Curated annotation (Swiss-Prot):
A Pfam family hit: CinA_KH
HAMAP family (alphabetical): CinA_B
Xref: InterPro entries: CinA, CinA-like_C, CinA_C, CinA_KH, Competence-induced_CinA, MoaB/Mog-like_dom_sf, MoaB/Mog_dom
NCBIfam families in alphabetical order: cinA_nterm (TIGR00200), molyb_syn (TIGR00177), PncC_domain (TIGR00199), PRK00549.1 (NF001813)
Superkingdom per UniProt: Bacteria
Family to which this protein belongs: Belongs to the CinA family.
Cleaved signal peptide residues: none
PANTHER family assigned: NICOTINAMIDE-NUCLEOTIDE AMIDOHYDROLASE PNCC, NMN AMIDOHYDROLASE-LIKE PROTEIN YFAY
Gene3D superfamilies assigned to the protein according to its UniProt record, in alphabetical order: 3.30.70.2860, CinA-like, MoaB/Mog-like domain
Xref: SUPFAM superfamilies: CinA-like, Molybdenum cofactor biosynthesis proteins
Lineage: Bacteria, Bacillati, Bacillota, Clostridia, Peptostreptococcales
Name of the protein described by the UniProt record: Putative competence-damage inducible protein
Cystine connections: none
Amino acid sequence: MRAEIISIGTELLLGEIINTNAQYIARELASLGIDVYHQSVIGDNETRLSEAFETAFKRSDVVITTGGLGPTKDDMTKETAASFFGKKLIPHEESLKKIEAYFKGRGLNVNEGNRKQGYFPEGSIVLPNPNGTAPACIIEENNKKLILLPGPPREMIPLFETQVLPYLKKFQDKFFSFKVLNVCGIGEGEMEEAIMDIVDHQTNPTVAPYAKPNGLTLRIAASGHTQKEADELIHPMEEQIRERLGLNIYGEDDISLEEIVAKILIEKKLTISIAESCTGGFLSGRLVNYPGISSVFMEGIVTYSNESKVKYLGVNPQTIEKYGAVSEEVAREMAEGICKSAHTNIGLSVTGLAGPSGGREDKPIGLVYVGICINGVTTVKELNLGGSRNRIRSLATTYTLDLLRREVLNRSL
């Protein structure tokens, strides 16, 4: 089965809001094994939307739209769909009653714009919207399906999960299973080289690598005549990939690197304190995203100036004078200093040059040192990163979390 997504709204077309609906729907359809080959964004224009329907139904079995179901004149998705299929818009009494009750309960009058939300192309399957006044609907015509959904994600997502997914599952002829492996610490080329023979000879399951801002992912997908069959095909492929990539794989599916690190620290009862310079609080911010981290995260401090490194971390001024603030030696003293002052098992430090100015030949922009002091034993890692100032800071944060993860696991603490 092939599906196409049409997102409706001039605000989307002009880039005024981000189109998260299409991303969500595409992922959900993929989980059902429904192929999505095309997506489009159409402004609030009846002619262009009708043309989009014409094109979409020539190549797709299911067309899903979001937006254009509101009470205003430029909300014309249902009107365009009715015209496209040669159908009339007719009242749906249950929806009209709910709309009237909604406004009456708030002491408001129902106008014609509100009432039109209770009208649908004749023969439609109406899907109630418990989170808004715009019900969705499904139109079935000539073995094709048009699904009209509201635009606000807080309305669209619950409606899709509870009503659209069960509807689409009735047409499944295969079952699908997916596993996403999250990778950090190696480049895309290095990862691809390590698993190239697997990728080249894939049939079922398939393996697809993706680059993301904070790392890489590998998506394993399998199909079968039953869900159990599809699930069982994933495991051998996953084991093969894990054997190749080892500790470079830090987690699965939607789990974040900071969540993995937090869980390791909590499980091993390792307290941590952090001293940041170039990352300016990014590192502490990422770690406190995880609920429960307060049981092990004792202290975080941004020591941006040389004076603050000396004052709060006890870094020797002569070390800074001799080696510079961005150096292995200063990163070491920062990590040991925060560990000592906070009385924690782990002291973590980051110092570097994020740019855009200040670099030189022996210390270029993107040079970062990470200090990790664990129970009195300190290691320092050098990173050479590229990109904008914020990109370097973000990458430094990610790599620091990953280096901490590896150090703790390698030491078998």
